[in-house]
Amino acid sequence: MIDPAQSILDIRQILGLLPHRYPFLLVDRVVEYVPGDYIKAYKNVTMNEPFFQGHFPGVPVMPGVLIMEALAQAGGILVVKSTDTAVEDKLFLFTGIESVRFRKPVYPGDKLELHCRLLKHKLKLWKMEGRAYVDGKLAAEAVMTAAVTNREDM
């Protein structure tokens, strides 16, 4: 097992693992992970997020689909760290989402904690459960499936 103190990834390392960039990079830091098992990361939600201009004026709430995307990105990091695959050659595609539940709104100033646990891995498919928390309270949850594919096949 990896010592959690050794498993912290900062934004520079995350940029080397995910193809996402502003404004769609939704993971700021990884605080713990165990390859093939789980990951804990977070996204600092600020009023400067472009989506708050229209969602919703006067009552800014993070869109649920972006909470799911943040969970999927954390899950993507877990997949990368669970394989020997060269990241530059691969894409991780969100292929399915089940049992989505939004429990609590996410507002500017919140620290969105992203927890993903690997459920199953078969060939190119990875299935995991994701949960997003704010202040220790469940904000959203889902079961997600992703496929790993070669960039050249796209």
Swiss-Prot record:
Signal peptide: none annotated. Pfam families: FabA. It comes from the Bacteria. The active site is at H55. Coiled coil: none annotated. GO terms for cellular component: cytoplasm; membrane. Keywords: Cytoplasm, Lipid A biosynthesis, Lipid biosynthesis, Lipid metabolism, Lyase. It is found in: Cytoplasm. One of its GO terms (biological process) is lipid A biosynthetic process. It catalyses: a (3R)-hydroxyacyl-[ACP] = a (2E)-enoyl-[ACP] + H2O. It is an enzyme of class 4 (lyase). Belongs to the thioester dehydratase family. FabZ subfamily. Involved in unsaturated fatty acids biosynthesis. Catalyzes the dehydration of short chain beta-hydroxyacyl-ACPs and long chain saturated and unsaturated beta-hydroxyacyl-ACPs. This is 3-hydroxyacyl-[acyl-carrier-protein] dehydratase FabZ. The lineage of its organism: Bacteria, Pseudomonadati, Thermodesulfobacteriota, Desulfovibrionia, Desulfovibrionales.
